């Protein structure tokens, strides 16, 4: 498997340090608000990474933290009358609810900052003792950026260039404008902990250094997060951890691209964000997950409702094919006629191409394309009156089910019972278009009675009324079925 390593700026073969095992640390949310689509994208991207590593046979330990003390949490507490702890608990629970709905596996370990204050203080003390950090008269602790010779290696920034634009805010006691806070002295009304430098709380960057080292051996195999974390957060993590331990912090640095709206990054600060819950009022969670996987995880993805509709259409087609396959396999009589050799070889080639796409830096966009190739092939078999009767066709359909189950387990897709999922999607699309499903069912019953009575004029009139509502009717041996046109 090849992974793009932000540190080396190239794809590299992924070789875990401990045979048969892999460690993955991903920076989690700051728990002060509901998650937006940027959070969904990061969670889905790293969920697929972890699933794929496990698919290859590795024993993966996945750690993702929660930042549960931060300026934003303190501010939200002041706005709502809740304590900082209550704010963090509320939004950590909301995160789990949202990601559970999106089918993201929970991390094996979910450390919280407030549960690791001792480790953070110890790391600060270690850095001070090594001359890499210093405390101030007011009780703040800062990291000496220039004491770490390779500062900037992840982001590709030059220290002297950064220095020219750096400023010291009033009241700060930095030796150098580039230095960043490891420990912040307590302000009135804020949560605090006792420390050798007085009451205070940790800075953001020290948190992940302390928690990752606590729960995983160094160097980490993979450290991940959104592209916005490359600088300063991940750059500062490297400086702290490597200055303190003398060890490499992580071998592979993996970063997902932004979700964009009108070519701008989606973020709370820009005010152009939609929460996951906003989107899931109109679409099924699996549709959103599918949409997020239609682009390579490192590329930006433009969020549009047209894009969501396209994802929904494609996901529906895949499930319709899975439903067809399920029904076709109910047959008990099959002929001895062979399938054309090119059909069997096309299935082999599709499986090879899917594996190749995923091995190439988790190219889910290409992998979904190969799944569509399989869907087209299977529909060709089912629609051909000769091929569909073949016992080899049965074997091909069973193989398709097996392939889709394996691939779906990696992508977190296609795991639902097809007929049930299609009904759910139909009702979701109906709700989005304000179609009264109870009225539809009533009209279908009336149409059924009209057909029994051979009142075809009335039956056709009802079909036309349903069509005006945006509903199409399919008459099947099992009775009338309906869907949104």
Curated annotation (Swiss-Prot):
Chain positions recorded as Zn(2+) binding sites: 27, 208, 233, 237
Binding site residues for ATP: 268
Annotated compartments: Cytoplasm
InterPro entries: Cys-tRNA-ligase, Cys-tRNA-synt_Ia_DALR, Cys-tRNA/MSH_ligase, CysS_C, Rossmann-like_a/b/a_fold, tRNA-synt_1_cat_dom, tRNAsynth_Ia_anticodon-bd
Keyword set includes Protein biosynthesis: yes
One MF term in the entry's GO annotations: ATP binding
UniProt-listed Pfam families: CysS_C, DALR_2, tRNA-synt_1e
The protein's Enzyme Commission number: 6.1.1.16
Keyword Transport annotated: no
Co-factor requirement: Zn(2+)
GO CC, one annotated term: cytosol
Gene Ontology BP terms: cysteinyl-tRNA aminoacylation
Domain of life, source organism: Bacteria
NCBIfam families referenced in this protein's UniProt entry, alphabetically: cysS
Assembly: Monomer.
Family: Belongs to the class-I aminoacyl-tRNA synthetase family.
Protein's UniProt name: Cysteine--tRNA ligase
Species in which this protein is naturally found: Oleidesulfovibrio alaskensis (strain ATCC BAA-1058 / DSM 17464 / G20) (Desulfovibrio alaskensis)
């Amino acid at each position: 498997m090849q992974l793009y390593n932000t540190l080396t700026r190239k794809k590299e073969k992924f070789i875990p340090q401990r045979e048969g095992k892999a460690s993955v640390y991903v920076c989690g949310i700051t728990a002060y608000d509901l998650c937006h689509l940027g959070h969904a994208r990061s969670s889905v991207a790293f969920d697929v990474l972890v699933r794929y590593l496990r698919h290859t046979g590795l024993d993966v330990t996945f750690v993702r933290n929660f930042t549960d003390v931060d300026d934003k949490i303190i501010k939200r507490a002041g706005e709502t009358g809740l304590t900082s702890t209550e704010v963090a608990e509320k939004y950590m629970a909301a995160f789990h609810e949202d990601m559970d709905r999106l089918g993201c596996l929970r991390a094996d370990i979910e450390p919280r900052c407030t549960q690791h204050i001792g480790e953070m203080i110890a790391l600060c003390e270690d850095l001070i003792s090594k001359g890499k950090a210093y405390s101030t008269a007011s009780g703040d602790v800062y990291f000496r950026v220039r004491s770490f010779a390779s500062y900037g290696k992840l982001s590709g920034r030059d220290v002297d260039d950064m220095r020219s634009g750096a400023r010291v805010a009033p009241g700060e006691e930095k030796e150098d404008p580039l230095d960043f806070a490891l420990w912040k002295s307590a302000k009135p009304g804020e949560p605090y902990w006792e420390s050798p430098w007085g009451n205070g709380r940790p800075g953001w960057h020290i948190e992940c250094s302390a928690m990752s080292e606590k729960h995983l051996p160094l160097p980490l195999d993979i450290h991940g997060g959104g592209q916005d974390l490359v600088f300063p957060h991940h750059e500062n993590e490297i400086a702290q951890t490597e200055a303190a331990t003398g060890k490499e912090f992580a071998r592979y640095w993996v970063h997902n691209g932004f979700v964009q709206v009108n070519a701008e990054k989606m973020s709370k600060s820009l005010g152009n964000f939609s929460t996951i819950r906003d989107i899931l009022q109109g679409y099924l969670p699996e549709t959103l997950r599918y949409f997020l996987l239609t682009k390579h995880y490192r590329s930006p993805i433009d969020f549009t409702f047209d894009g969501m509709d396209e994802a929904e259409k494609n996901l529906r087609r895949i499930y319709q094919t899975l439903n067809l396959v399920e029904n076709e396999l109910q047959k008990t009589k099959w002929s001895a006629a062979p399938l054309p050799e090119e059909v069997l070889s096309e299935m082999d080639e599709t499986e090879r191409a899917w594996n190749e796409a995923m091995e190439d830096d988790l190219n889910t966009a290409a992998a979904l394309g190969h799944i569509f190739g399989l869907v087209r092939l299977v529909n060709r078999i089912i629609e051909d009156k000769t091929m569909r009767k073949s016992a080899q066709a049965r074997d091909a359909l069973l193989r398709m089910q097996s392939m889709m189950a394996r691939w779906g387990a990696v992508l977190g897709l296609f795991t639902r019972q097809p007929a049930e999922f299609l009904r759910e999607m139909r009702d979701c699309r109906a709700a989005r278009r304000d179609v009264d499903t109870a009225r539809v069912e009533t009209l279908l019953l009336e149409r059924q009675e009209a057909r029994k009575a051979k009142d075809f004029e009335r039956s056709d009139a009802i079909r036309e009324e349903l069509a005006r509502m945006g509903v199409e009717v399919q008459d099947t041996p099992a009775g009338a079925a309906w869907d949104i046109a």
